[in-house]
């Protein structure tokens, strides 16, 4: 998780807020602030790669999201595009931040090609929606990780490269 990596690296002057539909994922987050979105909708489970569930979960928890955003000068929204929660909720959170006149930056990843065309279509759809609500966006295609990996790099090592790359 990118948030855990930034916390472990001692990033200062930042308040980290983990947002997820999945209760188990939130338990592993080192962020001091955590928001489990869509509790009534998902019952603490993930969004099942359904971006409409991710969006509905964020909508359900919008008041809580707005409360933690208030007072911020700048918000970075990090998400992996292509699944349900990040893809569906990122633009809802970004829209809320923009409505509060907060400078909003998206930092997202696109799926590996081997993850298939349907995941890439969801990612593209989520990315297009997110672009409407951020001041700027940084998009990192996961496929680019192969440029810095060797044939001997394991999937676990590749995941660590992914997390620790700026």
Regions found by a protein language model. Name each.
Residues 1-166:
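Tubulin/FtsZ superfamily GTPase core signature
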């Amino acid at each position: 998780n990118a948030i855990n990596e930034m916390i472990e690296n001692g990033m200062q002057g930042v308040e980290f807020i983990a947002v997820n539909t999945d209760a188990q994922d939130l338990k592993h987050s080192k962020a001091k602030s955590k928001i489990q979105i869509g509790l009534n909708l998902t019952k603490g489970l993930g969004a099942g790669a359904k971006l409409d569930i991710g969006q509905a979960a964020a909508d359900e928890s919008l008041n809580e999201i707005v409360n933690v955003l208030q007072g911020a000068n700048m918000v970075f929204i990090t998400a992996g595009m292509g699944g349900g929660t990040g893809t569906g909720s990122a633009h809802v959170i970004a829209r809320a931040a923009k409505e509060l006149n907060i400078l909003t930056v998206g930092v997202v990843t696109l799926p590996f090609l081997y993850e298939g065309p349907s995941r890439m279509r969801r990612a593209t759809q989520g990315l297009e929606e997110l672009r409407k609500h951020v001041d700027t966006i940084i998009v990192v295609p996961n496929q680019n990780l192969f440029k810095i990996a060797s044939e001997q790099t394991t999937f676990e090592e590749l995941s660590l490269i992914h997390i620790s790359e700026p």
